Structures are given as structure tokens and as C-alpha cells.
Amino acid sequence: MGLIDNIKKEAMGNRTKIQSSDAAELEKILNNLFYLDKNIEEETKFVEQVMTRGLESQERVGLHASAMLVGEKEFCLRAQVLSLIYKQSQGEQVPVGLMRIFKQGDAIHEKWQRMFIRGNYGSARDMDRTRVCDEYMLSYTPDLDVKIPKFFEGRMIGEIKSVNTYQFQRMTKHPSAWKQAQWYMHLCINRLKKLGKWNVKDYTKGFVLSEDKNTQDFKIEVYDYDSSLVAPFVDRAESIMYYYNRVYEQHKMVPRPKDATSPECKRCKDCFMREACWGIGKGKIKIKE
């Protein structure tokens, strides 16, 4: 075991934070947000935005950026292609225990988003705003799209995560949020490049803010954009578009994975495209074009 590993092990035993100098600097800046007065006008806009979010349509349509980030065992190319053609299963009612957890997570997100507004690091429209990548027929919704001049001269993507105390005390970084941060940075950079508006700095840095939902302590991870880390996600998105176009050009659908043996098998029973894939329930209902 190397020196760094020993330091990490000892720190976890002592419940000590391990952060880069960048992360420590950003944490200090964010701690100052707790002392600021409310920005009534902009926070009111944000609250209205939160309260009216999703009223236009409750139906899930198209790809979501997070679908590119799952592990190999969870990723299903066929399901993603089907989701661009047919309606998705909207799911059963979520158990109340899970709803309580979701609501707590929402509250933590909204608290931080309002504080970033107070710091004048972003406006209401920079918080939880869904964007669309036409190239991949894909939507993505960064928690934060902010600019903190004291820390970095460009705009940054930020992801907020609420975690339990056990996980918070033991983790040196959030297990999956770095993927979101890198992927969203990539999508934002590409969008600006296509518009001819990228200034070389924006979205080349991002961060993850993890809060202990019991103690309100928080940790920061800072990341520089790395195109090599998002290459697998880009490959998946491009594969989906290739096979989607093949459906119309060659009338061939992606075959099911080998372990997708029946609608009731472990691989398929909770799939969001199960009905369209197997022709059961409501079956294949085409999305209106």
C-alpha cells in the first residue's frame, strides 16, 4: 500500500476530509454563502420555476444523458433505440419511503441552488435547466451552471448529491457523480462550439458537492474536463443514433441482450421499454413526431 493510500485510510478512520487544494478553496468560498442576504427577486423566480417544473408534460420522451453512464450490465442498446421510437412505460407509483428520500434530496438541491443565486454566481435559469443535444436526441439537466470569478474565470457545471452519514464519512469521492460532471461539461462545450461561442475556458472545470443529509456537512470534488473520460459515453450515444437510423434505413431493430430471455426475467422485468420490446401490456405505441 502506497503513502497516499495510507493517508486516505487513516483519514477515513479519523473521519477527516481528503480534498485537493482546489476543493478546499472552493469549499471556503461556498461556506461564505451561508452569511449572505436573500436575493428576493431572483430566488422568487427560482421557486416559481421549481413549482411549475414538468407541468407541460409528465411523459418521458427521448434519451437522457444519465442513460449513457450506467454500467455495462445495466446498459441496453435495444432499450435506448426503442425509446426514440415508442412510448416508455411510465412506471408504477413510487413507494412512500422512497418518496420521502427523494423529497429530502430535492430540498438539499434547492437550498444550494438558492445560495448560488444569493452569491450572484448564477440566475434562476442556470439552475436545473434542461438542455437538448439534437445530435444525439438527448436531454441533460445540470444541477448548477455557474460562474465563480474568485475561483475560476469560466463557467462551471456543478452536481449536488445528498448522501447518508455512513457513506459521507467513508467516501473520498462520490462513486458516480464525476461521470455526470464530465459528461455535462462535454455536452455544454460541444453546444457552444456548434454555436461558435466557446471561449476555451467555459465548462473546462466542474465540481461535485456532496452533503451529509444528517449533519449538513459537505465535501467538494473539483474536476478538469477530460475528453478521454467521456469517450465511452460518446461511443454509446453514437451507437444509439447509428442503430436508430438503421431501423428506418434497413428496417432492422437491435437484438435483445443474451440475458433478456423473457419479459419476466431479471434483466427485463423493470425495464422502462419492456412493453414495447416484448409487445405486452400497452405494447408498441409510437411517439408522435
Spans of model-derived segments:
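Metal-dependent nuclease catalytic regions and adjoining charged, substrate-binding loops involved
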Residues: 18, 170-174, 189-289
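Metal-dependent nuclease catalytic cores that hydrolyze phosphodiester bonds in DNA/RNA
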Residues: 1-157
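Short small-residue beta-strand/loop micro-motif enriched in glycine and branched aliphatics
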Residues: 92-93, 166-169, 218
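Structural beta-sheet core signal
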Residues: 157, 183, 207-208
